[in-house]
Amino acid sequence: MKRIFSLGLGLLMAAAFGFASAADYPTRPITFMTMVQPGAQIDRLARGLSQRMSDILGQPINVKNVTGSHGTVMATELSRSRPDGYNIGVTSLTAYTYAPHHAKLAYDPASFDFLTLVALNSSGFISKNDKPWNTLKEAFDYHKKNNKAMVAMFHGADDRDAITRIAKLEGVKLSLIPSKGGPSVIKAVTGGHADVGYVGAILYKHVEAGSIKLIAAALGDRLPPIPDVPTLREQGYDEQVEMIVGLVAPKGLDADAKAKLLAAADQLANNPETAEFITGNLLMRPVTWGEDHADQTVRELYDTFGKQAAAMQ
């Protein structure tokens, strides 16, 4: 009888502890995973958001860099995490919207909760400042005229495929090098190992320093800090590459954890200092925050990229 009572008491205490743990979320440090190397613009965004969200939630938030395969390595690890709110991705959406149409993945893109979008990373194609071209079109013309292959370092699958399609259109042989994030692209371009590269808003400080130049804005419009450089479409290429960054969690996120994370995100969305950090400090573009908009954006991008992939077959 004593043993049965002890066992029952133990189960009751365990249940009570489990309930308290869920209701008191967070009770321990949280991890923000990101798919780029330290120092990359999305890494800086993740660290800035981690500090601000930590102040709201009352627990430390550590940043873990999980690089490789354009974000799919990080997405795989995140998909295998418990949906308890202690592992959250701060990542480009391409691993969930673009990659599923072009590679066999170890995860289902439907196995995630998309909590909110946080920023649109300003992005473009760059070259070393002393290269004899000032636009991407001129770069291809130069390589075509001199019968040379172009070496390009890419950031993700979408910009890789965009530059591949452009090279095919121009009739220029392309040699592709994968990267682990913006800093590695900058290093390759300035070191003369790549003729062109694709990066996010990290490009601004290097353009200002004079080590690189922007040769094509990759978004739908020109980048305001460098307004004289035309977009891909303005250079005659029907291409656009957008690096939208969001907060992502494993599917089936604990309800209390989800509510508190969404509430914290809502506070950040309405905080002028956070907006200044994203748009003024990081020079990223503002987006609409919120779970509904994130879900809609992911669905629309997934469908768009699916149709694009089908048309290419």
What are these regions, as identified by a protein language model?
Residues 22-111, 146-148, 158-159, 168-198, ...:
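N-terminal (or domain-start) structured segment
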Residues 27, 54-58, 224, 234-243, ...:
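A short C-terminal helix-loop "cap" of Rossmann-like NAD(P)-dependent dehydrogenase/epimerase domains
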Residues 53, 77-86, 100-184, 242-278:
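Hinge/capping helix and adjacent helix->loop/strand transition within the periplasmic-binding protein
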Residues 37-39, 93, 128-133, 154-158, ...:
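Short coil/turn segments
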Residues 27-29, 169, 255-313:
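An extracytoplasmic/periplasmic, membrane-proximal ligand-sensing/linker region
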Residues 1-27:
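Short, low-complexity disordered leader/linker segments with a strong preference
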Residues 108-118, 153, 173-177, 195, ...:
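Short beta-strand->loop
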Residues 46, 203, 294-298:
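Hydrophobic packing residues in well-ordered alpha-helices of helical domains and bundles
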